[in-house]
C-alpha cells in the first residue's frame, strides 16, 4: 500500500512539474506581458470579483498577506487599480480596476485566447475532448481535497495588528447579539486592548475567524485570561477546549503560578468549561448596572503551582 501511495505521489509531482512548465510557457509566450503569472492572477481576480479586498485575494489565491500587499501597491502606482473605502466599515477598502487596468486586462485575455487556440490547433477534436474531460476530472477530485482542507481548523499563537480590531468587533458583535450589551462594552474593549498582551491564540478555518483566547500580563507570576470566544459556526466541535488547552499549556511552560479571568454569572456556556480546567470562583461582586444590563461579575482563578 505504501509503495502504491508513493508511486501516486511521484506521478502527482511529475505532472505538477510538467504543468508548471506549461504555465510558464503560457506566461512567457502567450500572455507576452511584463506581469508574472501571479500578478496576472491577481489582476484577473480584481477584475472579476465585485467589491474585491486584499483579504479576499489572500484567501482565494492562497498568497501571503505581505506579497499581496506589495503587488496591490505596485498596481496602484501603475494606475491599474484604485481603492475605495467601504461605506459600511471604514476599516475596509475595496479594490477596483481602473480604465487603464481594464484595457490591459482585456488585451491579456484576447492574446491568451488567441494563443491557446493556436496551442490546441495541433490537437484533433477527439483528443481535445479527452483533454477537457481529464482537466474537469482533475479539478473535481482536487477540489474535494481542497474543500476538506479548508474546513480544518488551525490555531496560531501570534497576532497581527489588524487582528486586534477583528477581535474587538467579534467580541462586540457576540455580546450585543447574544446578551444585549450596549456600546459601553465596545468602549471598554477598545480601552483595555492597550493592556500588556502576553499571548493571543486565533483559530481559523479556510481563512475565516473561528475563535480566540488571550492572556494579559498581571504581574510576574499571574496572567489574566481574556477574549475567549468561539464563533457560532464552529461551536460544538471542541474548539473551546483546544484553545484553553493551548493557553494552559503555555502558562505551565512559562512557570506562571496563576491564571484568572473575569466573567458574569449569565455566561452559562463557558462555565462548565472553566470548571473542567480547574478554575474556581474566588470573588463575586454585587449585581450592578454594567454594559446596559444588570450583571453580577465573577472572578475565577486557576492555581498552577
Swiss-Prot record:
- Return the Pfam families for the record: Acetyltransf_1, MarR
Q: InterPro entries, per this entry?
A: Acyl_CoA_acyltransferase, GNAT_dom, HTH_MarR-typ, NAT_camello-type, WH-like_DNA-bd_sf, WH_DNA-bd_sf
Give yes or no: UniProt keyword Protein biosynthesis.
Answer: no
Which cysteine pairs make disulfide bonds? none
All residue ranges annotated as the HTH marR-type domain in the record: 1-140
The signal sequence is none
Print the keywords alphabetically.
Acyltransferase, DNA-binding, Transcription, Transcription regulation, Transferase
Which stretches hold the DNA-binding feature?
54-77
GO molecular function of the protein, one example?
Answer: DNA-binding transcription factor activity
Record domain N-acetyltransferase: where = 153-303
| Superkingdom as given in the UniProt entry | Bacteria
- EC assignment: the record states 2.3.1.-
Presence of the UniProt keyword Transcription regulation in the record:
yes
Function (record text) = Putative DNA-binding acetyltransferase.
This protein is called Putative HTH-type DNA-binding domain-containing acetyltransferase YbfA
**Species for this entry:** Bacillus subtilis (strain 168)
